[in-house]
Swiss-Prot record:
The gene is rps2. The lineage of its organism: Eukaryota, Viridiplantae, Streptophyta, Embryophyta, Tracheophyta. It comes from Psilotum nudum. This is Small ribosomal subunit protein uS2c. The keyword Nucleotidyltransferase does not apply. It is found in: Plastid, Chloroplast. Pfam families: Ribosomal_S2.
Length: 239
């Protein structure tokens, strides 16, 4: 795997609040190797460790992107939904930011059928196909379209299972993590001091509550993905 210097600055991580963990009474002992100290009842993460894991994660996604692999970003907490969609769109990734539907990966054949219906309704609406229906029929189809788009809009063009899944908030996204484990899909997960780092392939010890922390981490990962995609399209790599 090709390794790159990602110029990760500790001062930027400090400004983003990446180092703030949870209250000490809520900690998971498995996170002990990643904790630097305790301050006023709150665990402070070791940013040297965090930088190392982010670099490892960036190397992984860069190489995967350069090989044309597909990514799925998952984060369904309402206050970070816009961060997930924005980062995913910027890096041309799929995303889930409203609610994880059980079986979204492990029952992919069913999800595929729903996606086909969503695509069909999108095309029908775009072509004016709903305009010739009665108000009642049009309202029913628009309701179906709205609901499907809310849950599946971020994976509208996902034709196969993702190659790598990036997850924010381990506790909230446990179902997604378990599905990835069942299917042996590699995961990168932001893990705060109350999380279990053993549940993911590459844990990134970091504050999973502050928007500034999540934005900074997503920026690092999506930058690596974009650079990997550019590398795969460069003339010397297309021969």
């Amino acid at each position: 795997m090709q390794q790159t210097n990602w110029n990760i600055e500790l001062i930027e991580m400090l400004k983003a609040g990446v180092h703030f963990g949870h209250q000490t009474r809520k900690w998971n002992p498995k996170m002990a190797p990643h904790i630097f100290m305790e301050r006023k009842g709150v665990h402070i993460l070791n940013l040297i460790q965090t930088a190392r894991f982010i670099s490892e994660a960036c190397d992984l996604v860069y190489n995967a992107a350069s090989e044309g692999k597909q990514f799925l970003l998952v984060g369904t907490k309402p206050r970070i939904a816009h961060l997930i969609s924005s980062a995913a769109i910027k890096a041309r990734c799929h995303y889930v930011n409203y609610k994880w539907i059980g079986g979204m990966l492990t029952n992919w054949s069913t999800i595929e059928k729903r996606l086909q219906k969503l695509r069909s309704l999108e095309i029908r609406k775009r072509m004016g196909g709903l305009d010739n229906l009665s108000k009642e029929e049009a309202a029913i189809l628009r309701g179906q379209l709205s609901k499907l788009h809310k849950y599946l809009g971020g994976i509208l063009y996902m034709k196969n299972l993702p190659d790598i899944v990036i997850i924010v908030d381990q506790h909230k996204e446990l179902t997604a993590i378990r599905e990835c484990m069942i299917l042996d899909i590699p995961t990168i997960c932001v893990v705060d001091t109350d999380c279990d780092p053993d549940l993911t392939n590459i844990p990134i010890p970091a504050n999973d509550d502050a928007q500034s922390s999540i934005r900074w981490i997503l920026n690092q990962l999506t930058l690596a993905i974009r650079e990997g995609r550019c590398h795969s399209m460069s003339p010397k790599n297309s021969k």
